[in-house]
């Protein structure tokens, strides 16, 4: 294992009376691109991107793409569709590379983009047209003189940290809300060097798996590192030799539970279809069928006002908590991974053990949650929130994945370039697996 991988391996994140979690030196991060957005003329120095000056000096690249158009400013958001057309962008700068997207993975944020919820990303970026798609594998073409992370001919994953803060953590996501970024749904694109992590030469795994890995499993890596480190600050390995880790959610949750399993935890995931329960079990994770408590969907506006709803919800919550007690021998859950949000948050907190951690990097079904701070303080519950990762975490995750086979089982069907609209329809209708992939170039 490389030094970087060792530094970031979740089992290396230890907290004792004499030492805290490992720190990442700032020098590990590509500079200065990681701390600025594309086309950001407000940042001085080598990372500066001056739109006017650049457009006069650069030649434009024209490519075929599936393009998202801006909605009408000031109007209510209306769902739209992508348009297949020619898209144009400037030649790569000195810290950028021209790339050919090969395989992409459909992500939830792509659905949010065409639904224009919670934002119209075109209007938010101040751009009439945007190319989305922020998970996948590319072939690296011409590289700028200052690029050090990849070389021409490399196969690399897209690392979708589009604009980072001073410590390298993302503020905006590439091919979503990061200004000027051009995503995977184009025959050619331009990536900054800190959006590219080269794959191991002669990798044992398919490009489809790496495409599915690039966003979800790196998200899982960063979230698990902090959640597990937080738990170990509360309870060391003598106090709690085998933590009980549960998860709501899909692919990211499954990836995170894979890390928990590798760290020696007892792992459980909740899902609601036969095929997904089978996939979970095949990964060595205990599956729990959510259909046993199908009415576990908390709605504060209906609770205690709608008698039938309240009765059904209360019964479902009771069934769920009984299931947790049975599987954990009454000890409850030490880390609960919750990528669902408001509908299950009440039940999640009730299932959490003392000194427990509830952790998330998403908000699939509700961004606003309520809790009683006094109760959480007394129980010493810790709430972890992360958003994707910083570059050195991505590098470590790739190294660990290659060494230990920690990659997702990508869907068997690969959508073709002409089938992109069908992919979006199938995804929105729930007719895909957790890792639907599509091909852009051969």
Q: Model-flagged regions — what are they?
A:
Residues 89-106, 117-166, 180-183:
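Glycine-rich beta-strand-centered segment in the early N-terminal region that forms part
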Residues 61, 346-349, 391-442:
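C-terminal hydrophobic helical "lid"/dimerization subdomain
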Residues 352-353:
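Helix-to-beta-strand junctions that scaffold the AdoMet/dcAdoMet cofactor pocket
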Residues 251-252, 343:
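Hydrophobic/small residue at the entry helix of a nucleotide-binding pocket
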Residues 144, 160-161, 249, 271, ...:
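Conserved "cap/hinge" positions at secondary-structure junctions
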Residues 241-243, 262-343:
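Adenosine-nucleotide cofactor-binding segment
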Residues 289-291, 356-361, 371-409:
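Rossmann-fold dehydrogenase core element
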Residues 160-247, 293-304:
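NAD(P)H dinucleotide-binding glycine-rich loop of Rossmann-like/cofactor-binding domains
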């Amino acid at each position: 294992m490389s030094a970087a991988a060792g530094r970031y391996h979740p089992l290396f994140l230890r907290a004792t009376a004499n030492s805290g979690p490992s720190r990442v030196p700032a020098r590990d991060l590509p500079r200065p691109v990681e701390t600025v957005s594309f086309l950001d003329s407000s940042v001085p120095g080598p990372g500066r991107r001056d739109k006017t000056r650049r457009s006069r000096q650069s030649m434009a690249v024209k490519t075929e793409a599936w393009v998202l158009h801006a909605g009408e400013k000031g109007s209510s958001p209306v769902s739209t569709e992508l348009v297949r057309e020619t898209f144009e962008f400037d030649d790569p700068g000195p810290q950028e590379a021209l790339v050919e997207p090969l395989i992409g993975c459909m992500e939830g944020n792509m659905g949010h983009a065409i639904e224009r919820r919670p934002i119209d990303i075109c209007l938010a970026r101040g751009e009439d047209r945007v190319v989305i798609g922020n998970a996948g594998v590319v072939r690296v073409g011409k590289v700028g003189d200052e690029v050090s992370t990849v070389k021409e001919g490399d196969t690399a994953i897209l690392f979708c940290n589009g604009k980072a803060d001073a410590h390298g953590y993302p503020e905006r996501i590439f091919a979503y809300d990061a200004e000027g970024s051009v995503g995977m749904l184009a025959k050619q694109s331009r990536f900054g060097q800190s959006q590219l992590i080269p794959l191991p030469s002669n990798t044992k795994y398919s490009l489809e798996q790496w495409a599915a890995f690039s966003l979800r499993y790196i998200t899982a890596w960063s979230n698990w590192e902090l959640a597990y480190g937080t738990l170990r600050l509360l309870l060391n390995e003598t106090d709690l030799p085998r933590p009980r880790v549960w998860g709501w959610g899909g692919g990211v949750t499954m990836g995170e539970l894979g890390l928990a399993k590798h760290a020696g935890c007892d792992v459980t995931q909740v899902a609601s279809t036969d095929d997904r329960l089978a996939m979970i079990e095949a990964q060595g994770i205990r599956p729990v069928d959510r259909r046993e408590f199908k009415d576990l969907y908390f709605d504060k506006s209906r609770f205690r006002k709608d008698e039938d709803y309240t009765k059904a919800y209360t019964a479902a919550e009771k069934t769920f908590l009984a299931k947790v007690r049975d599987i954990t021998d009454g000890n409850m859950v030490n880390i609960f991974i919750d990528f669902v949000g408001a509908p299950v948050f009440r039940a999640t907190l009730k299932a959490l053990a003392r000194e427990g951690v509830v952790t998330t990097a998403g908000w699939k079904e509700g961004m606003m949650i309520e809790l009683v701070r006094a109760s959480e303080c007394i129980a010493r519950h810790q709430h972890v929130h992360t958003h994707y990762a910083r570059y050195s975490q991505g590098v470590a995750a790739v190294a660990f994945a290659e060494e230990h086979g920690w990659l997702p089982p990508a869907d068997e069907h690969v959508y073709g370039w002409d089938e992109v609209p069908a992919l979006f329809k199938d995804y929105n209708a729930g007719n895909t697996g957790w890792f639907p992939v599509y091909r852009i170039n051969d």
